Amino acid sequence: MFKRKIEIHHEEVFEGLGAARQYAEEAQKSKMRYKAFLERLKSLDIKGRYLDVGAGSGVVAGTIAQHYPDVQLTALELSADMAAVGKEHLKDKGVQDQINFVVGDAADEELVHSLGKFDLIYSTYALHHWKNPRKVIDTLMTRLTDKGLLFLHDLRRVWWLYWIPSQSGFFKSIRGAYIRAEVQDILKGLNPEYYEIKNEFPFLLSIIIRKQTI
């Protein structure tokens, strides 16, 4: 068995703007990791208001803003330093007026409720970091419009990477990532009207949750 292992990532602790900027630069260089997410997002063809949960330095939000100028985004990020760097990044791209950065925790129900309703709520590579994913997903579902959609894109735990004895952030994330059956167990307690969980090649997990069946 290769049980889920929760390990602290050194990269998750951003001590100051310098560390946040370094992380942001690395994220910019590895845009290919978001390719599958952006392709699926395009196929969903959702207009209106988006909420990016765990927005980091705004790489994904900025890319979406450039491709979909009519979409209004709220970027929720736990780290104040990362959010500050994100604002710089968005200004450089010229999309700062399209995106509102908010510092806070997705597990904070009061904060999330204060953000309003969204046509799409998404997260990229954040699910495996949430201490209480059921609570976060439940809270996010309440912020969807009647036909809104929650899209979670993350790594998937696979045996052929799990056993590699590396302490890099990527391999720690692989060991801490969920598999399809575990996500199903999380969602069972929430009773969404519709959901789909897909294993994506080579080690990704795509989760779509609809508040209302269309």
Residue ranges and their predicted role:
Residues M1-D45:
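Conserved class I S-adenosyl-L-methionine
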Residues L51, V59-D108:
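Class I SAM-dependent methyltransferase SAM/SAH-binding core
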Residues G56:
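Conserved glycine-rich SAM-binding loop
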Residues D108-L115:
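Short conserved loop adjoining the S-adenosyl-L-methionine
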Residues Y122:
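A conserved beta-strand element that flanks and buttresses the S-adenosyl-L-methionine
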Residues Y125-A126:
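Short catalytic micro-motifs in class I SAM-dependent methyltransferases
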Residues K135-D146:
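A short glycine-rich, Lys/Arg-flanked "PGG" loop and its adjoining helix->strand segment in the class I
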Residues F151-S206:
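C-terminal alpha-helical "lid/dimerization" subdomain adjacent to the S-adenosyl-L-methionine
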